[in-house]
């Protein structure tokens, strides 16, 4: 017995309309108003759009207001007029946002990578990792080449005398980081394999130098020490290997995998709460950094060409090169994808930290762009560690800039050395503010350029580093989108799934017997439609 379809009335009840497949669809009041051309439907559309993009709009407005507020306070006397106590209170909301984000970096990175590595079968893990590293390597090389080309074309360091005279006191040459190239790469290898996982959560290994008197001769001796700063590279490597080990345990590792997945989900709930505070923190972070600068106008006047070269390179790579790569492989609109991650991009600009932006980026690519959790939570932490397109581009521009300041010519061999060294050193660049400047000394030493001029780079790094971070996290997100597209196409072509996600929604009672239906460590071979899967059609992936 078929019931009569509901009929619309003047009180706003939905009316039934036939669909193409013979069914009935309910037309809402908004749809009826839009069909009639009334203004009510337009207002409702605008209201829904504002509600859906409220956080994005608030974040963009926060950046604009932060710049205006910072320039206004700077024009009224800046940090000197405020005094130390008022300045500390002025930047406190931004400091609070950084502390909230850094608080959840460690559990988020470790739990997401363990859960992600454990939810992929070994073959898919290797393929996804290889494609991700290839994408990161190619885009970093393209960014480095673009940086060198722009610096050679625009000649930002041509007016060396004026820049040295005006900004020479902005930093101290003695404080510039000086490290041998070999020791830098050895430190990178040491940090990949930390000797203590607990200390790796807040310290990393770094080589320093001290002069010793050996047989009447002053010799520079390398001395290893632990320095402040999370060794995120070592934690990433350990988490991936530990996740693979849990997968190898089979049913015995399911309970621990579910624990890490649940821990990760709880962390993402915290992220969703922090996101609504992000606009306030970003506004005061941007404003506070502008207020702390002594003379913003002078720096822009003297180093404007260098700043323009860096920002132009980041804009070209982020708005043209990366979207073009995404479009060529996915045939989808890349700018629609970028619109879904506007909030993390603005957060990256405000915090100047790829690691601090990681929680927001995970949530946005999953909810707004449809990237699967086991992909985003596996790829994005790796990208935040090894993918530094913005840093590589900035380092190449800075190296050519310093060469022009020093009036040293760059031949073909030196240019290739800059490209290769910038790409390699950016892999180990920490996802923290000013991380790129710390590795710039490696490039300068590789091509025998003076390290003293790094003080000029530090004078404007507060702005360039923010642009670098935006480009870095954009590359991470687009890489996750590309891998999601690759997985979708591969699963359609193959007769068996490549990715087997561990079901974290199972009840957390004592470890049950490995039943056939809910065991995520078994591959199910689908037969013809309607046929039941028998035990002989299942094969363990272990």
Swiss-Prot record:
Subunit structure, as described in the record: Homotrimer.
Residues on Extracellular side: 83-95, 155-225, 287-307, 402-414, 449-461
One Pfam family hit: SDF
Modification Phosphoserine occurs at: 494, 504, 536, 540
Keyword terms, alphabetized: Acetylation, Amino-acid transport, Antiport, Cell membrane, Glycoprotein, Membrane, Metal-binding, Phosphoprotein, Sodium, Symport, Transmembrane, Transmembrane helix, Transport
Binding positions (Na(+) 2): 385
Listed SUPFAM superfamilies: Proton glutamate symport protein
Topology term for the membrane: Multi-pass membrane protein
Reactions the enzyme catalyzes: L-glutamine(out) + L-serine(in) + Na(+)(out) = L-glutamine(in) + L-serine(out) + Na(+)(in); L-glutamine(in) + L-serine(out) + Na(+)(out) = L-glutamine(out) + L-serine(in) + Na(+)(in); L-threonine(in) + L-glutamine(out) + Na(+)(out) = L-threonine(out) + L-glutamine(in) + Na(+)(in); L-threonine(out) + L-glutamine(in) + Na(+)(out) = L-threonine(in) + L-glutamine(out) + Na(+)(in)
One Gene Ontology term, aspect cellular component: melanosome
Compartments reported by the entry: Cell membrane; Melanosome
Intramembrane region ranges (chain numbering): 335-365, 415-448
TM ranges: 53-82, 96-117, 132-154, 226-249, 259-286, 308-329, 375-401, 462-483
Keyword Nucleotide-binding found: no
Residues involved in Na(+) 1 binding: 383, 387, 472, 476
Gene that encodes the chain: SLC1A5
Single GO molecular function: L-aspartate transmembrane transporter activity
Region (Disordered): 509-542
Family: Belongs to the dicarboxylate/amino acid:cation symporter (DAACS) (TC 2.A.23) family. SLC1A5 subfamily.
Name of protein: Neutral amino acid transporter B(0)
